[in-house]
Amino acid sequence: QEFAELLLSDEAVAPIGLGARDSLRLEAGMPLYGNDMTVDVTPAEAALGWSIPKLRRTGGERAGGFPGADKVLAELGGGAARVRVGLRPEGRAPIREGVAIWNADADGVQIGEVCSGGFGPSVGGPVAMAILPAGLAPGDTVWAELRGKRIPVVVADMPFIKPDYKR
């Protein structure tokens, strides 16, 4: 309580809620455990390959030796069948968690579903993330089924906004 009050005593600081945190996270392309990464999603599928240290990778000093190492290391070598991608729906309607993603605007096959999505205030439109087949590239079009209608969605690079911080 005392710490929060100290922070809020600065007029440049304002309290925010989970909605603000979530929109910032989405725009930054950061995954949320339980949505974009689960026990059924590997680090390679979640685009988190950087989290596996070089010494634990194939050929590293202490290669493998962690739960799921065989699968994870094979996928890091280029074998992931699906990956987390950014999506930019056309129009203003956000696509949210659970919305089906299809490979065609009519008929076609469901190829995944949105794991996180919402409105991105900094980009001025809806943004989303989904785990989809690995062959998709930025600029490719897929379709989201929203309220019984399929809308075009463009696969996009993440983060949706370019960071302006210094490393």
Where do the language-model regions lie?
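Conserved, structured C-terminal
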Residues: 1-167
